[in-house]
Amino acid sequence: MTLESLNALTSSEAMKQFELCCGSSGWVRKMEKNRPFNSIKNLFQKAKSIWFSLSIDDWSEAFLHH
């Protein structure tokens, strides 16, 4: 999927795509709220900063999906 395609998705479609990347519902919601991304670098920076802002419970939720 291109960045442009990701940015053009509806909120629910984008959340489904983010769920494929991470099982934390908090991470998924925050990623969706940070759209649109202006570059791939920006997307990865947001993904990383959101991940490290999550609670231990959010991390546990993500790890349960592995």
Model segments located where?
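Aromatic-anchored, charged helix-turn/loop surface patch used as a conserved interaction hotspot
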Residues: 1-10, 16, 21, 26-66
